[in-house]
């Protein structure tokens, strides 16, 4: 049974309409007073969303480490696969060593785990703002607060909650289905999907945290990307986690957005750990609105510029190159940013960059939906939207490496992988827009990408 969340008001809180995913009892197993109390509330309990974005820190420039090879066509993939994959190779991999924690010497009473009670309550309170409890046991997260695995899981859960809150506030009558799933090989995920809302035809925001041993096929693919991986008895422990989303509005004047941010770690036979981050965010409008394009790209550029002036132009070009529908000679949309295999200058600095990008999703996109969700449109414009969505489907099924690998990987969670597809799409034989029309205008941009900000 899925958990249905109904909007309480324009504020950041929700009503739990009915239990799901095993019911409240399953939630209480995550531990922690905050979650336990949450699980014991009635069906009309209040579940609050996370606070707004925090400030970001300045950082040195980011880049690819010595293991990365090639350009935008090498080692991409994973957006859809990571969101639902269950053994996936395209989605990055690793095993994170558990960090030991020392109790603080203040007068604060410590728990049996050696953590101050206030810090335990803070983590439980933070988790209570998510769409569902973390995939990883709360006690495990407490034992390794400084570990990147913990930081990234909390970031993707926060991102999921913030985006879902923003979408529901815009939609007005939105009900998110919250589907918590488990992977028998290790880990699981949370898929939040809204369908047939007032504003959004389909909006999916999924997170996954999976771990286990990398399959030989996955290891082979990673070696083809330049990764040097030494196995022990043919095994490579891995961990992969990320957030992935595609949002399709009903109005043809409101654009579609896609984003995903992910972290991978792999442990080799000698104990050496390889890690890297990947992700991106891109916009696919049905009709070109230059003001919207500038706003979207400027917001992403501002997030990138906090960590180096060279990042946005590099990742913008990478995005244009990756989201290319070769048989059509068109890009899927007007781009954004895209990157993979980021593993320098340090884990913390790359994480802060990814954090800045994730926190830019809502301000880059929600104003555009609010601006256009009530625009009038003609049947011809709706028809063009359906044709453009056909192109979206073509790219996802034919070119996106994460989707393709997920579909052919045993144990994959197909529903999560195909979550990115729109509810409706259309194909017409030999369709061609009129010359100098609004439809021809967007095609020109898709065939010849522009620089929207400098």
Swiss-Prot record:
Name by which UniProt lists this protein: Oxygen-dependent coproporphyrinogen-III oxidase, mitochondrial
Region (Disordered): 43-70
Effect of mutating residue 189 to S: In HCP; <5% of activity
Family according to the record: Belongs to the aerobic coproporphyrinogen-III oxidase family.
Molecular function as annotated in GO: coproporphyrinogen oxidase activity; protein homodimerization activity; structural constituent of eye lens
Pathway membership, UniProt: Porphyrin-containing compound metabolism; protoporphyrin-IX biosynthesis; protoporphyrinogen-IX from coproporphyrinogen-III (O2 route): step 1/1
Residues reported to bind coproporphyrinogen III: 244, 260-262, 411-413
Reaction it catalyzes: coproporphyrinogen III + O2 + 2 H(+) = protoporphyrinogen IX + 2 CO2 + 2 H2O
First and last residues of the transit peptide: 1-110
Residues the UniProt record annotates as site (Important for dimerization): 327
Quaternary structure, from the entry: Homodimer.
Role according to the record: Catalyzes the aerobic oxidative decarboxylation of propionate groups of rings A and B of coproporphyrinogen-III to yield the vinyl groups in protoporphyrinogen-IX and participates to the sixth step in the heme biosynthetic pathway.
Connected disease: Hereditary coproporphyria: A form of porphyria. Porphyrias are inherited defects in the biosynthesis of heme, resulting in the accumulation and increased excretion of porphyrins or porphyrin precursors. They are classified as erythropoietic or hepatic, depending on whether the enzyme deficiency occurs in red blood cells or in the liver. Hereditary coproporphyria is an acute hepatic porphyria characterized by skin photosensitivity, attacks of abdominal pain, neurological disturbances, and psychiatric symptoms.
Keywords in alphabetical order: Acetylation, Disease variant, Heme biosynthesis, Hereditary hemolytic anemia, Mitochondrion, Oxidoreductase, Phosphoprotein, Porphyrin biosynthesis, Transit peptide
GO biological process terms on file: heme A biosynthetic process; heme B biosynthetic process; heme biosynthetic process; heme O biosynthetic process; protoporphyrinogen IX biosynthetic process; response to arsenic-containing substance; response to insecticide; response to iron ion
UniProt EC number: 1.3.3.3
Annotated positions of the N6-succinyllysine modification: 404
Main location: mitochondrion
PANTHER family recorded: COPROPORPHYRINOGEN III OXIDASE, MITOCHONDRIAL, OXYGEN-DEPENDENT COPROPORPHYRINOGEN-III OXIDASE, MITOCHONDRIAL
Domain of life: Eukaryota
Record region (Important for dimerization): 193-202, 392-428
